[in-house]
From Swiss-Prot:
ATP binds at G155, G157, K158, T159. It is found in: Cytoplasm. Plays an essential role in the initiation and regulation of chromosomal replication. ATP-DnaA binds to the origin of replication (oriC) to initiate formation of the DNA replication initiation complex once per cell cycle. Binds the DnaA box (a 9 base pair repeat at the origin) and separates the double-stranded (ds)DNA. Forms a right-handed helical filament on oriC DNA; dsDNA binds to the exterior of the filament while single-stranded (ss)DNA is stabiized in the filament's interior. Domain I is involved in oligomerization and binding regulators, domain II is flexibile and of varying length in different bacteria, domain III forms the AAA+ region, while domain IV binds dsDNA. GO terms for biological process: DNA replication initiation; regulation of DNA replication. InterPro entries: AAA+_ATPase (IPR003593), Chromosome_initiator_DnaA (IPR001957), Chromosome_initiator_DnaA-like (IPR020591), Chromosome_initiator_DnaA_CS (IPR018312), DnaA_C (IPR013159), DnaA_dom (IPR013317), DnaA_N_sf (IPR038454), P-loop_NTPase (IPR027417). Residues 111-329 are annotated as: Domain III, AAA+ region. The gene is dnaA. CDD domains: AAA, Bac_DnaA_C. Keywords: ATP-binding, Cytoplasm, DNA replication, DNA-binding, Lipid-binding, Nucleotide-binding. Residues 330-452 are annotated as: Domain IV, binds dsDNA. This is Chromosomal replication initiator protein DnaA. Oligomerizes as a right-handed, spiral filament on DNA at oriC.
């Protein structure tokens, strides 16, 4: 590699790392190699499954680096190596070749949703380990974490990761036998095959898979499903013994799956257990910026921040809010989505999810908080750090977040021009204090009653 080529490639990596989350960079970029730059074409060696990501996300990076170093537009030619994920992708083991030559396996509909991929999964601190583990499993199925057990509340991306794993493996090995299924549907299939007295067909279908993706495994945790648990236990063993990958999702940890046989709980913990928690403000903004690409509207940045401040429990609420906005925008024939439009569109959803929300001016909250703690509104908005003023300021921010539908940036602006992260810090601090301090709870209820 020439000196200029090295400078060019270092610049590509530098720009990519500055624009991507670390886990995304590590997986999609770090192992790529520049072979040469000839004329205005850069030849890059990488895994073929990562080409689409480069085409969608890194072309501008290469162009920028090309102009900086060579003062010309650089295009990319991809060369693909035979990757580990290809050579180790799920395949039928050789010791079964003779057996399977005379036995036709039933066709398996994989039921994967093609819209879910690693490329369009938004990474934050709350899901980084789950994402990294999922990428690792897809890259080397059956060898790294088996099973992979992902748990967390609804609407946090567990199903997205399941499908992304399946789609990634399928891209590497189109012949892989993959099945995505909810635990509820597994139960239903078991019941149907019992009634038809055709259990051999069910065993062939599930025990000869290369990759089994089970969603919401907690549905299996019932005493009345002992026979189904037995069948799943045997299916799990058959797959695991043959180094076939199993990925499970749940709304709780394996140990919290009451009424699930202990031998299954033990097996669920054989591999890696990772948690996904609700997205923080920055991740919600990133999710919204990703999702709005599906809509033909222009969202103002303050609108995105407003929406991110309204729904903090899961991604489905954010997706639902965008659908609400789309309906209003279509009806009113709008091109630009302002905060006012968004607030109108999501009002019903906010009332359903947070019936406590009331239209209250932030100034009223500041006045009542100030009276209670013996400070002025001016002091609350100031930069003074005396203990009683800081407490009043944080309580005011907490109540503004709890009792109004204002975004975090808007609340911060009303409290002396502070940014959303300061408001979020104050909110979380008071929330934690309320969980431990009964006297603060009483103070809070007193202030709330005066505000109302």
């Amino acid at each position: 590699m020439t000196e200029n080529e090295q400078i060019f490639w270092n610049r590509v990596l530098e720009l990519a790392q500055s624009q991507l989350k670390q886990a995304t960079f590590d997986f999609f970029v770090s192992d790529a190699k520049l072979l040469k730059v000839e004329g205005n074409i850069a030849t890059i060696l990488l895994d073929d499954m990562k080409k689409l990501f480069w085409e969608k996300n890194l072309q501008p990076v290469v162009l920028t680096a090309g102009f900086e170093v060579f003062n010309t537009e650089i295009s990319i030619e991809y060369v693909f190596e035979e990757t580990q994920s290809t050579s180790n992708s799920p395949q039928i083991s050789q010791n079964k070749t003779a057996e399977l030559a005379t036995e036709t396996l039933p066709f398996v509909q994989n039921d994967l949703n093609p819209k879910y991929s690693f490329d369009n999964f938004v990474i934050g601190d709350e899901n980084r380990w789950a994402f990294t583990a999922s990428v690792s499993v897809a890259d080397l199925p059956g060898t790294t974490y088996n099973p992979l057990f992902i748990y967390g509340g609804p609407g946090l991306g567990k199903t997205h990761l399941l499908n992304a794993i399946g789609n990634s493996v399928l891209a590497s090995n189109p012949k892989a036998r993959i099945k995505y299924i909810s635990a509820e549907n597994f139960i239903n299939e078991f019941v149907v095959h019992i009634r038809l007295q055709n259990m051999d067909e069910l065993k062939k279908k599930f025990r000869n898979l290369d990759l089994l993706l089970i969603d919401d495994i907690q549905s299996l945790a019932k005493k009345s499903l002992a026979a189904t648990q037995e069948e799943f236990f045997n299916t799990f063993n058959a797959l695991h013994d043959n180094n076939k990958q199993i990925v499970l999702t749940s709304d709780r940890t394996p140990d919290d799956l009451n009424d699930l046989e202990q031998r299954l709980v033990t097996r669920f913990k054989w591999g890696l257990t990772v948690n996904i928690t609700p997205p923080d403000f920055e991740t919600r903004v990133a999710i919204l910026n990703n999702k709005i690409q599906e809509y033909n509207y222009s969202f103002l940045s303050e609108t995105i921040e407003y929406l991110a401040g309204q729904f903090d429990s899961n991604v489905r609420d954010l997706e639902g809010a965008l659908k609400d906005i789309s309906l209003v925008a279509n009806f009113k024939k709008l091109d630009v989505i302002t905060v006012e439009v968004a607030a109108e569109a999501i009002r019903a959803r906010k009332q359903d999810s947070s019936p406590k929300m009331i239209v209250i001016p932030i100034e009223d909250i500041q006045k009542q908080v100030g009276k209670f703690y013996g400070v002025t509104v001016k002091e609350i908005k100031s930069t003074k750090r005396t203990q009683n003023i800081v407490l009043a300021r944080q309580v005011g921010m907490y109540l503004a977040r709890e009792m109004t539908d204002n975004s975090l940036p808007k609340i911060g602006k009303e409290f002396g021009g502070r940014d959303h992260s300061t408001v979020l810090h104050a909110y979380n601090k008071i929330k934690n204090m309320l969980a431990q301090d009964d006297s603060l709870k009483i103070e809070m209820e007193t202030i709330k009653n005066k505000i109302k």
